[in-house]
Structures are given as structure tokens and as C-alpha cells.
């Protein structure tokens, strides 16, 4: 049972490592076409692991980028901003003024109720 618990605790770390590797591969794939790649290094165990991970992750990154390309276009983002503005920000000025006015009135009423009658006087005398 404890072995199973250890596996579940290690899962977020593993997912994070895979995500970092995917980002690295994606950044390497986005190099401009005229740039030269670094000279090949002698094959070590680590470079073999790196190349194998790159070979496995590269298709996933490419597919994900192609599937989510519509989200980064100007249409959906602009539509989201317009909807957000109309829903939340369009009448922000009048709402803010009304809130400030009611807050000011509330604070003045509290201050007058706390003020001793000798200093502030009675309201009935005005």
C-alpha cells in the first residue's frame, strides 16, 4: 500500500518534468531556419536519453500546437475581450461613482454618530 502511495506522490513531479522537456523541445523546434545547429557531440548515455525523449515528445508537441492554434489567433481572443468588456467593464464608471458616494455617506454617518454632541452639536439644531 505504501508503494502505491509513493507512486502517486511522484506523479506530479514526473508530469512536471515531462512538461519541461516538452517546452524545451518546442523551443528548439522554433529556431529560425537560417540558424545552424550545434555540432554533434559524441554519443553518451545522457545524449541517447535526450534524443529518445525528444523523439517521443516532439510529435506530441507538434500535434498539440496544431490543435490549439485556433486559440492564439486574433479572433477568439478579441471576442473574449469584447465579451468581458461588455459584461464587466462597460458601466464601471457609474458603478464606481455610486459606490464612492455611498461609502462617503456611510463614513460620514458613522463619524457623526461617534462624535460627541458637544463637538458636533445636535442635528435638530440646524
UniProtKB/Swiss-Prot annotation:
GO term, biological process aspect, one: triglyceride homeostasis
- Give the signal sequence positions: 1-27
Places the protein is found: Secreted
Q: Which Pfam families match?
A: APOC4
Q: Name one GO cellular component term.
A: very-low-density lipoprotein particle
Keywords, in A-Z order = Lipid transport, Secreted, Signal, Transport
Q: Which family does it belong to?
A: Belongs to the apolipoprotein C4 family.
Q: What does this protein do?
A: May participate in lipoprotein metabolism.
Q: What is this protein called?
A: Apolipoprotein C-IV
Write down the species: Otolemur garnettii (Small-eared galago)
